[in-house]
Amino acid sequence: MIKVKLVRSWIGCKPKQRKVLDALGLRKIRCEKSFEDNAAIRGMIAEVKHLVEVSE
């Protein structure tokens, strides 16, 4: 399992990055979600790595 936490605001981000955050379910700062570890989730995290913290 991977835990992803939004630590920076998405204001000023590109629309693609906003869509990725929506798909991950991260809408507010300090919002945290758990996901299965797979390539799709890793790719989404890579798109917004400057906005989130990842722990395993």
UniProtKB/Swiss-Prot annotation:
Keyword ATP-binding included in the entry's annotation: no
- Keywords, ordered alphabetically: Ribonucleoprotein, Ribosomal protein
For this protein, the record's NCBIfam families field holds: rpmD_bact (TIGR01308)
- One of the protein's GO biological processes: translation
Q: Which InterPro entries match?
A: Ribo_uL30_ferredoxin-like_sf, Ribosomal_uL30_bac-type, Ribosomal_uL30_ferredoxin-like
GO cellular component terms, semicolon-separated:
large ribosomal subunit
Quaternary structure note? Part of the 50S ribosomal subunit.
Per its record, what are the GO molecular function terms? structural constituent of ribosome
Q: In its UniProt entry, what is this protein called?
A: Large ribosomal subunit protein uL30
Coiled-coil stretches noted in the UniProt entry, renumbered to this chain = none
In which domain of life is the source organism classified? Bacteria
The opening ranks of the lineage are: Bacteria, Pseudomonadati, Thermodesulfobacteriota, Desulfovibrionia, Desulfovibrionales
Keyword NAD present in the record's keywords: the answer is no
Q: Which HAMAP family does the record cross-reference, listed alphabetically?
A: Ribosomal_uL30_B
Say which species the protein is native to: Nitratidesulfovibrio vulgaris (strain DSM 19637 / Miyazaki F)
